[in-house]
Each structure stands twice: as structure tokens, then as C-alpha cells.
């Protein structure tokens, strides 16, 4: 059985943050990430630190953030113990990289990725650990070929780890990024997994590496294809309207957001995923046979790619 190596995970996650930031800056060609390094004394409700990096007003990206954090606490918050009661009363460490990119152009999808590691320990008992993460895509004006490329890349990421991994983690993504009050998915999905510890530590660690590095391979070719597509006020207004769904999901359902806020995490870093602008419109209905209607009819429901 392979040994749990927290330091190796932390080092890798910091390197992954660097690598992703570099590739996104290259794609944007103008904006750079501004780093806000932060630290909290262990005596706080949630101690630890991180590197919040935010990009604004680029050629391609209106706003985006790539966060690394490593925090420790003496008790897990309710959002974590609700489905894992055995964690109650254990001290814990959580570390991860989380990112969201909001492009200017409505034809370029919003994207999100996350890889994380949790370990909960109690004296005299074996540690409870797991990995989690994934990546998902939220197009406003989707192209079939882009969606297929995104999911084919996800399949390639999963293939070395088992024949059924993609299907399982795709289905989990479809279920997780679903807004029950709207009756629709947030986007076209991708991969999502949590509580990953059924393999040995090293294999689980290798899987989050593949997912973390697969994000740019899946996303940047789509950005490259769509970033020069012409658009007007109609497309921009629809993009802002659909960004409202992103806000609704993150504030109402997202376990990472809830965990961070309930455990006394750093609010600015937790809410980094919010879009810079969004809008709501009462009782909106897309025009029949329009590109906007196509999004609802063909893409905001689970399907095989």
C-alpha cells in the first residue's frame, strides 16, 4: 500500500497553479494574473494560507481566477460532515487548486476546474483521506464539435485509470452541476468526482494530476477557435443572463463554496469564481428556433458525446 504524502500533493498543486496560469496568460496575450498571497494563523477558525491569482480585462478573458489554498481546522464544517458523519470531531487539512475563467466573447465558453485533497485525522485512528475534482464547460452558444472535443479529451484523461471511469465521472458531473430550481444543467459537464480513495494513494494522486493537466488541453483549443468570432449586443446580453445561472449554482448548491464559507474561509478567494457582470430577466423565454433556444433544447440536459 502506497504512503500518504501530503507534502508531495501540496508541491504538485502549487506547480499546477503556475502551469495553468502560464498557459492562460499565453492564450490571452495581454492580461497577467495578479497574485494575492494570504496567510492565517492556526489559532483562527480556519488556519493556513494560499495564493489567489486573478486576471482582469484581457484580450480574451474578462475575468478569471486560479486559486491555490492549504487550510487546516479542528473540526469539519456541516457541509462536509452531512454525508460523512464519521468525520465529525476530526481535525482536517484541505488543499487544492480551483479556477474559473469568464471570457469576453459569448462564443467562448466559461470553464471551471478543480483538484483537491482532504485528510481528516484523529489520534489513535487511521486517517481518512480522499481526492476530488474535475472540470466542466459552460457554453452560451455551443458548437457540437467543441462539446465533442471537450468530452473526448476527458475520455483520454480517464482511459488509463479504468474502462468505466469516464462514464462514472461524467454522470457524476451531470448530476452535480444541475440546478433543480431551473430544471437544467449548468453547462455540458465534463468530469466530477469526490471521495476518491478506492485505489491506492499513488494511483489516486496520478488521476488528479491527469485531470489537472487535462483541463488546458481540453479548453484552450476551443478558446483558440472561438475567440475571434464576431458578436453583438444580443449575444452579450444573453451571455450575461446565462452567467446568472453560474451565480445561482455557486451560491446555492456548490459544496466547495459552502464548505469555504461555513468553515470561516477567506471570502474574497471563495467568491473569486463569480463573474464580473451578470444579469437576471423576469420570465425570460428564448425566441423559437433561435441559437439561444438551441442551448436549452439540446445542451442543458445530460447527453452522450
From Swiss-Prot:
Catalysed reaction, written as an equation: coproporphyrinogen III + O2 + 2 H(+) = protoporphyrinogen IX + 2 CO2 + 2 H2O
Co-factor requirement: a divalent metal cation
Positions that bind substrate: 98, 114-116, 264-266
Binding site for a divalent metal cation: 102, 112, 151, 181
Record InterPro entries: Coprogen_oxidase_aer (IPR001260), Coprogen_oxidase_aer_sf (IPR036406), Coprogen_oxidase_CS (IPR018375)
Pathway in which this enzyme or protein is active: Porphyrin-containing compound metabolism; protoporphyrin-IX biosynthesis; protoporphyrinogen-IX from coproporphyrinogen-III (O2 route): step 1/1
GO process annotations (BP): protoporphyrinogen IX biosynthetic process
Single Gene Ontology MF annotation: coproporphyrinogen oxidase activity
Chain positions of site Important for dimerization: 181
EC category name: oxidoreductase
Subcellular location: Cytoplasm
GO cellular component, one term: cytoplasm
Keywords associated with the record: Cytoplasm, Heme biosynthesis, Metal-binding, Oxidoreductase, Porphyrin biosynthesis
Active site: residue positions: 112
Residue span of region Important for dimerization: 246-281
Protein EC: 1.3.3.3
Domain of life: Bacteria
Family as reported in the entry's similarity comment: Belongs to the aerobic coproporphyrinogen-III oxidase family.
Binding partners and assembly: Homodimer.
Record function comment: Involved in the heme biosynthesis. Catalyzes the aerobic oxidative decarboxylation of propionate groups of rings A and B of coproporphyrinogen-III to yield the vinyl groups in protoporphyrinogen-IX.
NCBIfam families noted in UniProt: PRK05330.1
Protein's name according to its UniProt entry: Oxygen-dependent coproporphyrinogen-III oxidase
Species of the source: Vibrio vulnificus (strain CMCP6)
Amino acid at each position: 500500500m502506497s504512503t500518504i504524502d501530503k507534502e508531495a500533493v501540496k508541491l504538485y498543486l502549487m506547480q499546477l497553479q503556475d502551469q495553468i496560469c502560464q498557459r492562460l496568460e499565453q492564450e490571452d496575450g495581454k492580461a497577467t494574473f495578479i497574485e494575492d498571497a494570504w496567510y492565517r494563523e492556526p489559532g483562527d477558525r480556519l488556519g493556513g494560507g494560499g495564493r489567489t491569482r486573478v486576471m482582469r480585462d484581457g484580450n480574451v478573458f474578462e475575468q478569471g481566477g486560479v486559486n491555490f489554498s492549504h487550510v487546516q481546522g479542528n473540526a469539519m464544517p456541516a457541509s462536509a460532515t452531512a454525508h460523512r458523519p464519521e468525520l465529525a470531531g476530526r481535525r482536517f487539512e484541505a488543499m487544492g487548486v480551483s479556477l474559473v475563467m469568464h471570457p469576453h466573447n459569448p462564443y467562448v465558453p466559461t470553464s471551471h476546474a478543480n483538484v483537491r485533497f482532504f485528510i481528516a485525522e484523529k489520534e489513535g485512528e487511521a486517517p481518512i483521506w480522499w481526492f476530488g475534482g474535475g472540470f466542466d464547460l459552460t457554453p452560451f452558444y455551443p458548437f457540437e464539435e467543441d462539446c465533442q472535443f471537450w468530452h473526448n479529451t476527458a475520455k483520454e484523461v480517464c482511459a488509463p485509470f479504468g474502462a468505466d471511469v469516464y462514464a462514472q465521472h461524467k454522470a457524476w458531473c451531470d448530476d452535480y452541476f444541475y440546478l433543480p430550481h431551473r430544471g437544467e444543467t449548468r453547462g455540458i459537464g465534463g468530469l466530477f468526482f469526490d471521495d476518491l480513495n478506492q485505489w491506492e494513494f499513488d494511483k489516486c494522486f496520478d488521476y488528479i494530476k491527469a485531470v489537472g493537466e487535462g483541463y488546458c488541453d481540453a479548453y484552450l483549443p476551443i478558446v483558440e477557435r472561438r475567440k475571434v468570432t464576431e458578436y453583438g449586443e444580443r449575444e452579450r446580453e444573453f451571455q450575461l443572463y446565462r452567467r446568472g445561472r453560474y451565480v445561482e449554482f455557486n451560491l446555492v448548491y456548490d459544496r466547495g463554496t459552502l464548505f469555504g464559507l461555513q468553515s470561516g474561509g477567506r471570502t474574497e478567494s471563495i467568491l473569486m469564481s463569480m463573474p464580473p457582470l451578470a444579469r437576471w430577466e423576469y420570465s425570460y423565454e428564448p425566441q423559437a428556433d433561435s441559437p439561444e433556444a438551441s442551448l436549452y433544447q439540446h445542451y442543458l440536459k445530460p447527453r452522450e458525446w
